[in-house]
Amino acid sequence: MKLLTNIGTLLALSPVQQVSATPHTGEHYNLVKLEGYGSVSGTTVNSTLTKKDLPTTVDAWMGIDYALQPTGHRRFKAAEWPKPFKGVKRADSYGKTCIQEIASKTPLESQSEACLNFNVFRTKGVPLSKKLPVLVWIHGGAFFSGSWASFDGAAFAASSKEPIVVVNFHYRVNSLGFLPSKLFKDEGLSNLGIRDQRLLFEFVQKHIGAFGGDKNAVTIGGRSAGGHSVGIHYFHNYGKDNKALFAQAIHQSGSVTSRAFPNDTYPLYKTQYDEYTAYLGCDNKKTNKATLKCLREADIDSIRNISTKIFYDYNDVLTWPFQPVQGGPLFEKPGSQSGYDGTFYHVPTITSNVNDEGKFYTPGNLETDSEFLDYLHNISPALTKKDLSELSALYPDPAKYDNSPFANSPNSTQYNRISAAWSDYAYICPGQETAYRASTAGVPTWKVRFNTNNSFPAWQGIPHTADTSYTWNGESTQYPEISHIYHGYLSSFVTAGNPNSHRYPGSPEWPAYHGDDESPLQIVVQPGDTKVEKDEIRKEACLWWRDPERAPRLNK
C-alpha cells in the first residue's frame, strides 16, 4: 500500500467551483477608486467554494491585478507595480491562477502567466468609510501549486463575529516563482514568488483603505508553504526591506525554519536545474543573457510539464525542487539566525500544527533502522554519523524495542517512526521555535495543536492539511463544532488581536504561550475536549532539532 499523498491529491480534495456572485445591474456596485491606479466595481458572494449557502452574504471585489503581469519579457523578473487604467473595471469574478500542474482546482483553462491578482471579501452592510481589520492569506501547495481555491475567503469573512476584510491572492509558484540556480543568484532573480507576496503587501498598504480596510490592522496568515512564507516575512526585520507591512501573523503548519531552505548553489538544486534547462533546450553553459533569453522564450506548456515532472521525480523522498532560498532577496539570513539575533517583527503571532503532520507525506515502505536513517540523511545530507546515531536513539526503533512509542504501525515497521521524525523536523519543532523566539522577546504569542480529523483514513492519524476547511468554518467538515471553535479563535485574533475576545461560546480561554516556562501552555483543538495542555510533545527531540549548533547542517 502506497501511503504517500501527492500534491495532486491535495489539490483534488475538493472540486473547483466558480463563485456564486450576485449580478448587479445599473450603477456600479460598491465602486472603489484606487488612487493612482483606477476604479473597480464589486459584487456580492452568497455561497462557499463548494456551493453551500454562506451564513451571510459578503461584499466582494475579485480578480484585480496588483502588478504588471509577468509575461513575455517580464517572465523570470521581479514583479512591478501595475500601470494606471481609465474607466471602471468589473471585479466580479476570479482571475487566472498561476501556471502549475493541471488538477481539479486548477484546470488548464483557469491558468495563465498573467496571474498576479487578488480578491477582497468584506462584511456586508458596513460603510466603506469604516476601516475594518484585514486578514491577508497566503495559499500553500509546497511552493509548487495553489490558488484562490485553496482558501475560502468569503466563508472566513461571512463567519466572523466581528466585521472583517479578507484578502487572498496568487503568487508565482514552481519554476516560474522559484528556480534556485547560480544564474538566478547572479542575476538577482531568486525568490520571485516571495517577492510577489511582498508586492501584494505593499499594494494592500496603499489601497486597502479604499475597500474599507485598516492598513494598520493587517494580519498575514498562511498554511503550509503559505505558513513558511509568513515565517520568511515575519523573520525579515533587517536590511533594506524591513518596513513593517503587517501588524500580526498566523503561522499555520509553517515556519521560517520548517523543512529546509538551502541556498542557490545547493548541489541537488543544480541537478534539478540542469534537468530543467536540458528539457527546455536552454544551454546553461552559455552566457547568462543567452540562457535567460531562452528560458523567457520557452513554451509555457513545456515549462508546466517539466516543472511537474521534476517535482514528482523528487516527491517520494521529499527533496522538492522550486523552493525559496536562503541568501536570496527577503531571505538573506537563515531563519534560525534571525531568531537568535531577534531580527523579526515583534508583532503578535499564532503558531499551529496538526498532530500527525508527516503522515500526509511519509512513505509506508521503510522496514529497518538503516532505511529510517538513510531517508532522513538523504533529506539532510550534512548530518554527521553522530547526528544519525542520536536520531536513532531519540526515535526508538520499533523493530528493536517493543515499548517504542512508534510500534504497531498500520503498515511498514517504520511508518509511525519516520512520520514522527519528519513531522518534528519539518513542522512541529519549527513551530515551537517560532513560538519560543517570539514569546521570549515579549511578543504576545499563542500556540495550538490541532487534533481533529477531517475524513482521513485512521492509519493517517491527523495529517497535514486536516485543519484546512476548519480554518474558515467549513460547512461540511467531519466535526462542525470544531469549525466554529477554530475559526472563532482565528477570526478573533484578526479582529481583536487576541483569540479569546470573540471566541466561539463555550470554548475555553486560550492562554498565551511563554517559551521560557519549563512547560509552556498551548491549546489542543479536538472533538468534545478542546482544552489547555502543556507543550511537551517529544520535548527532547524538539530540542535536538532546534539546536543552534545543528541548524546550519539542517539548512534552517
UniProtKB/Swiss-Prot annotation:
Coiled coil: none annotated. GO terms for molecular function: hydrolase activity. Residues 1-21 form the signal peptide. Optimum pH is 7.0. It comes from the Eukaryota. The keyword Secreted applies. Its main location: secreted. It holds the Pfam family COesterase. Induction: Transcript accumulation reached its highest level in 4 hour old cultures. Its EC number is 3.1.1.1. Keywords: Glycoprotein, Hydrolase, Lipid degradation, Lipid metabolism, Secreted, Signal. GO terms for biological process: lipid catabolic process. It is found in: Secreted. Belongs to the type-B carboxylesterase/lipase family. This is Secreted lipase 4.
